[in-house]
A protein has these predicted regions:
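A short mixed-secondary-structure module that forms the rim of ligand-binding clefts
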Residues: 34
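N-terminal intrinsically disordered, cationic/polar leader segments
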Residues: 1-31, 41-107
C-alpha cells in the first residue's frame, strides 16, 4: 500500500509524504507506483525549475519515501501546482483504493 499524507496549514496544501510500494504489481510493471512517482517527481521538478519557492525534500528509494515541504507559504502559482498534484493523487486513489491511501494532516 502506498500511504500519502498531505500537509496542510491554514487550509493550504504545503507539502506531502509518500511512503511505501503499492503492491499492485511487481517492480517495473506497477502502474500505480508509476503514476504516483510521475505525479510527485514532476511536481518537485516543476517547483525547482519554474518557481522561486524554497522547499525541503527527503527521499529514500528503498522504502519508496518522498517527503516534501515548502519552507514558507507557497506562492499562488506553486499553490496551483500542489493543488493539481493532490487532485491527481486523489483521482488515483479513487481508481486504486486498495493500493493507495491519502490522509490530510494539519501542521
Amino acid at each position: 500500500m502506498t500511504n500519502i499524507t498531505i500537509y496542510k496549514s491554514n487550509d493550504l496544501n504545503i507539502g506531502f509524504k509518500v511512503f511505501g510500494h503499492s503492491g499492485y504489481d511487481e517492480a517495473g510493471k506497477d502502474i500505480v507506483c508509476a503514476g504516483v512517482s510521475a505525479l510527485t517527481i514532476n511536481f518537485i521538478n516543476s517547483i525547482e525549475e519554474f518557481m522561486d519557492d524554497r522547499f525541503v525534500v527527503t527521499t529514500n528509494e528503498e522504502d519508496g519515501m518522498i517527503d516534501f515541504k515548502f519552507e514558507t507559504e507557497p506562492s499562488k502559482e506553486s499553490q496551483v501546482l500542489i493543488d493539481s498534484l493532490v487532485f491527481g493523487l486523489e483521482n488515483l486513489e479513487q481508481d486504486y483504493k486498495d493500493f493507495i491511501s491519502i490522509e490530510f494532516q494539519e501542521v
